[in-house]
Amino acid sequence: MKAFILSLLIIPTLLFANPKPKTKTINWISFEKAIELNKTNPKPILIDVYTDWCTWCHKMDASTYKEEVIVDYINSNFYAVKLNAEQKEDINFNNHTFKYVGNERRGTHELASSLLNGKMSYPSTVFLNKDLELVQAIPGYLQAPIMEKLINYMGEEIYLDKEWDTFDKEFKSKI
């Protein structure tokens, strides 16, 4: 009987004591750091344009950007940047200083506005090629299966040779 009671006490302790496996995360860096790294090791840049108040941005962080296939591919093939569309700090890029425009309560960052062609939508995913040229800005929440297709299409520069519709039909998901 003592052994039974002891096992009832020990087993739950052991179950809850097991550390959870470490979750992989995307190596988010600043825009400036991505530009700097690109000089010595050119890679495309994925930019997640978000705001602090955006519910769908938080949902995308908690789901799409936690999917292991997505995390691994982005970390291997892109410089990943989180760009707060309402940040107040200046960003220097291509001999231009991008600033926050607006007042304390409402405004946007010029870089976010430039990348999104003035069509402010959050979240938005922006792809720059290795030469730091805008390839595509995609507005809205992206579920993991769609993101997986997009990062492969952009990361491997398939867009240079193949239409999206053809690629979309041929793509084999790992999710």
Task: Give the label of every model feature segment.
Residues 1-5:
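Positively charged n-region of N-terminal signal peptides that target proteins for export
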Residues 8-17:
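Hydrophobic h-region of N-terminal signal peptides that target proteins for export
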Residues 27-45, 74:
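A short beta-strand-turn-helix
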Residues 41-55, 80:
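Short active-site neighborhood of thiol/selenol oxidoreductases, capturing the structured segment around
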Residues 58-75:
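Typically the conserved alpha-helix immediately C-terminal to a functionally engaged Cys/Sec
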Residues 80, 111-114, 120-138:
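A short, hydrophobic beta-strand/beta-hairpin element that forms part of a small beta-sheet core
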Residues 97-119:
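Short, internal strand/loop/helix patches
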Residues 134-175:
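Thiol-/selenol-based redox modules, centered on thioredoxin-like
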